[in-house]
Amino acid sequence: MKLPRELGPIHFVGIGGIGMSGIAEVLLNLGYHVQGSDAAENANVLRLRTKGATIAIGHKPENLGDAAVVVVSTAIKRDNPELVHARELRLPVVRRAEMLAELMRLKQCVAVAGTHGKTTTTSLVATLLDAGKFDPTVINGGIINAYGTNARLGAGDWMVVEADESDGTFLKLPADIAIVTNIDPEHLDHFKTFDAIKQAFRAFIENIPFYGFAVMCLDHPVVQELVGTIEDRRIITYGENPQADMRLVDVNLDGGMSRFNVVVRDRKAGQGKRFEERRVEDLLMPMPGLHNALNATAALSVALQLGMSDDAIRSALRGFGGVKRRFTRTGEWNGAQIFDDYGHHPVEIAAVLRAARASTKGQVIAVVQPHRYTRLHSLFNEFASCFNDADVVIVADVYAAGEPPIDGADKEHLMRALKAFGHRQAMVLRAPEDLPALIRSLAHPGDYVVCLGAGNITQWAYALPGQLAAPVSKAS
């Protein structure tokens, strides 16, 4: 039995969240009656309202109205008044991943998992399949610039989704094709141990049907280890690793672009003799960074398996519009470029700064707002050593995301640790309003100013070009 067409109102608690809003939008486009609530208005709430959703601001029992089912994310606490009332009424309450799984059962699906790179890779797969005339349905964890939204309903047979591993519910997703970009220690509040994370990813791959396949990054040692444990499922590996089936070669990251070729190895054709190889050449993507070239190689692996031509792939990559908050240029001041990036894990931060370093001959000035005290505390040494490609590091207050402070996990301690680990120029940001003056004193033509974090630093990044362009008062 599949999701009934006549279901009654579907109520989303926290409908403005990036994961919830994408599912809500596809349901709206399918003709379902969607309603919900959120703590505050945001762009996702406003967009869903224009599509016909009824959305209340604030969480109250009466918001449920005539709801037939209630959808919640793991961010919703058990004492949420709407969730409490739904259980009093004996309404079905489903997790976000369960509702996503119901939508996935309507299509053939590509699910993109990994600690980092999921959103960009999901966007790249969607872009390639779109160019290949597959007209996919897409549910992403970030705003795809070409769509202006994180979701779209396509008329084709394929769906592309971002599989969020943070609470383990990605194991509910019925994928035909699975991508794993990397596996790092993250979300230990849920998994408790790194071994548990590894086991979850193994289960994710083993859940694919025998006629499907997994695309896995051989450059990442934990993923390579996982490849060696998977039996009875078809695996396509990718990366710079010489053993990869889809080998990334000839990478050139100059000028804010990624230029590369991919060597395609056909294991079937090569049985009993040398593997047959061919090259997909002259690939260019308007996003810098080795990590993005790897993400593109993962997407290309899927596209080739589904029968897309090299020319169609080449054209789609050149036109890729990127994802909001992934190395997004927000403006320029005095020849210095300003960027906004969602990177909030040390691995992500290092990759973004490496891309910035490869793209400019000027300075790289990193402005970081650590996200969550628990993350900074558990990965403190990694944070202290992930800024090597930044000439200057400016550390702002931790964005708490509702967490209480932890001793030693704050901007002062991180700044001191950066210096202790050998960084030559690290400083704290006393207050957000001090940032423009600080950047004026540091930035020169050709420099990159990269604002990093999953909190409200995105607002600083978009405000900064205008603040820098404003006349400086004599008092300051």
UniProtKB/Swiss-Prot annotation:
Output the SUPFAM superfamilies linked to this UniProt entry: MurCD N-terminal domain, MurD-like peptide ligases, catalytic domain, MurD-like peptide ligases, peptide-binding domain
Principal location listed in the UniProt entry: cytoplasm
Q: Where in the cell is it found?
A: Cytoplasm
Q: What class of enzyme is it?
A: ligase
- Catalytic activity field: UDP-N-acetyl-alpha-D-muramate + L-alanine + ATP = UDP-N-acetyl-alpha-D-muramoyl-L-alanine + ADP + phosphate + H(+)
- Which Pfam families does the annotation name? Mur_ligase, Mur_ligase_C, Mur_ligase_M
- What does this gene product do? Cell wall formation.
Annotated family: Belongs to the MurCDEF family.
Question: What name does the UniProt record give this protein?
Answer: UDP-N-acetylmuramate--L-alanine ligase
Source species of the chain: Beijerinckia indica subsp. indica (strain ATCC 9039 / DSM 1715 / NCIMB 8712)
Protein encoded by which gene: murC
